[in-house]
């Protein structure tokens, strides 16, 4: 399982990033039916500031690695970060990229 954190104290921003994450997850499920992610929304400024100084715009953490700061990621960027996280897991799934 991949753990993902959405960092933003503004609910509409978290919602937009969560929709992108779910779209990326659904795309990966087509080729990896056992793929799972756990999404946590970090809302408290004090918790966000432990990870990044950028608090006005959303940020994204994948398996405790800060991958996106202060912007809304594109679905295909998120797919790339999730694929990378899959490959780094013990007993990971082999990910093949299409042509």
Question: For each predicted feature, which ranges?
Answer:
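Short acidic DE-rich linear segments
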Residues: 89-99
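Non-catalytic, surface beta->alpha helical segment in thiol-disulfide oxidoreductase systems
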Residues: 62-91
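Hydrophobic beta-strand residues in large extracellular and virion-surface proteins
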Residues: 4-6, 37-39, 78, 82
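Thiol-based oxidoreductase modules, predominantly thioredoxin-like and allied folds used
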Residues: 34-45
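Local sequence-structure signature of Cys/Sec-based thiol-disulfide redox active-site neighborhoods
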Residues: 1-30
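Structural micro-motif
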Residues: 52-61
